């Protein structure tokens, strides 16, 4: 996904495809699962402790930073996927008012404002 800020400092709208969302989710999920197996803790529970500064990370500082980062990516992409799905459902509901809903095989994309 390309993104940029224009000369006036205003964020530009960008698009992200469902393929990009799903690829990011798959990669983030794979990595967070490795950490869950290593530390015997769900990512959600880990992230709660991490966010509150309750972990004595010591020798695990790098692992914990990576785990938190990939978990945040996973959460962000899950939100993107939900927004994309809701937008498609809204369009399908509009179509349904006129009859049958047609689902095309063309890849949907989501416009996002990057912070």
Give residue spans per PLM region.
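Extended, charge-rich alpha-helical interface modules
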Residues: 2-115
């Amino acid at each position: 996904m390309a993104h940029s800020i224009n000369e006036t400092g205003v964020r530009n709208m960008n698009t992200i495809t469902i393929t990009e969302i799903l690829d990011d989710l798959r990669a983030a999920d794979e990595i967070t699962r490795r950490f869950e197996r290593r530390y015997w803790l769900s990512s959600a529970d880990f992230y709660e402790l991490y966010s509150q500064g309750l972990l004595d990370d010591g020798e695990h500082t790098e692992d914990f930073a990576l785990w938190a980062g990939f978990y945040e990516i996973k959460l962000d992409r899950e939100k993107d996927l939900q927004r994309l799905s809701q937008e498609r459902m809204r369009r399908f509901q509009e179509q349904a008012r006129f009859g049958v809903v047609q689902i095309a095989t063309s890849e949907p994309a989501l416009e996002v404002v990057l912070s």
